[in-house]
A protein has these predicted regions:
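Conserved, mostly hydrophobic/aromatic
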Residues: 21, 43, 74, 83, ...
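Alpha-helix C-cap/termination motif
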Residues: 23-24, 49-53, 77, 109, ...
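Catalytic pocket-lining loop regions of alpha/beta-barrel enzymes
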Residues: 81-82, 94-190
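Soluble or luminal CAZymes and related metallo-dependent hydrolases
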Residues: 9-16, 35-39, 63-66, 99, ...
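Active-site gating/metal-coordination segments in enzymes
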Residues: 28, 36-115, 119
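A general structural detector for well-ordered alpha-helical segments in enzyme core domains, enriched
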Residues: 16-20, 39-46, 70-74, 99-103, ...
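Short coil/turn segments
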Residues: 7, 34-35, 119-122, 146-148, ...
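Mid-to-C-terminal alpha-helical segments outside catalytic/metal-binding sites
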Residues: 1-28, 186-188, 201-233
Length: 233
């Protein structure tokens, strides 16, 4: 089994991902489905096969009538540790309390971290993420891609006034990470790769250039997410 890179339609397997991790010196990483082909069972099977290497995040379309039941299932039966939301792919505006409040309520009762795919489009502007997140301060939220390209400053602003909101760095520019680090410090930044869209070693190099302090870099490269997910060790 495996998943496809949405840019190339080439297939990649979990073993390919682990090899890329090994080459870059990465111990553990999050894996999840693409928005185009949600397969929570496959992610759970992958995590079960590689429990010390891959942490599985599930995915759901909030517009589905069984969305909250799906979240309960992916957390309680499949054992996944987080929830990815893709407003652009699934066609909803994030600042919709009627749609998103039940999703965040389900994430809260299942103690899931929420990852929001948030490039710079009107479906998922950081201020919209904040609108929902501020009603659920106990649910950690990762703004994926930091709102790249045009919403980075807004993402930094939102994270600065909401301690439960974190910025995930995949797809962002080096300067963006520097700006976030200067404004927030290291405690609300989480390194991501969007593999296979990028490579683990390239993303680590970006973080090393943006965050020269070794202790702060350790937080961004793993310790922050380790704490949010309750991973021991």
């Amino acid at each position: 089994g495996g998943t496809s890179d949405y840019l190339t339609a080439e297939s990649y397997t979990p073993e390919d991902m682990i090899r890329a991790m090994d080459q870059a010196g990465v111990d553990m990483a999050v894996g999840c489905s693409l928005g185009q082909m949600v397969d929570n069972s496959f992610i759970a099977e992958t995590m079960a096969l590689h429990p010390t290497r891959i942490v599985g995040f599930g995915q759901v379309n909030p517009r589905n009538v069984d969305a909250t039941e799906t979240i309960d299932n992916l957390a309680q039966k499949l054992g996944l540790k987080g929830l990815k939301l893709h407003p652009t792919m699934h066609g909803y505006h994030f600042a919709d309390h009627g749609l998103l409040d039940p999703i965040f309520d389900a994430a809260q009762r299942n103690k899931l971290v929420v990852l929001v795919n948030a490039l710079d489009d009107p479906f998922c502007a950081p201020l919209s993420v904040e609108e929902i997140s501020r009603s659920f301060p106990d649910v950690p939220v990762l703004i994926a891609h930091m709102g790249t390209v045009w919403n980075v400053n807004e993402a930094i602003l939102v994270a600065r006034r909401n301690p439960q909101i974190y910025l995930e760095t995949s797809g962002s520019q080096l300067l963006d990470v520097k700006l976030a680090y200067r404004s927030l410090g290291a405690s609300q930044i989480v390194m991501g790769t969007d593999w296979p869209g990028s490579d683990f070693d390239l993303e680590r190099a970006k973080i090393a250039r943006a965050i020269p302090d070794a202790g702060d870099r350790a937080l961004v490269e793993g310790a922050n997410l380790q704490r949010l997910l309750g991973i021991q060790g």
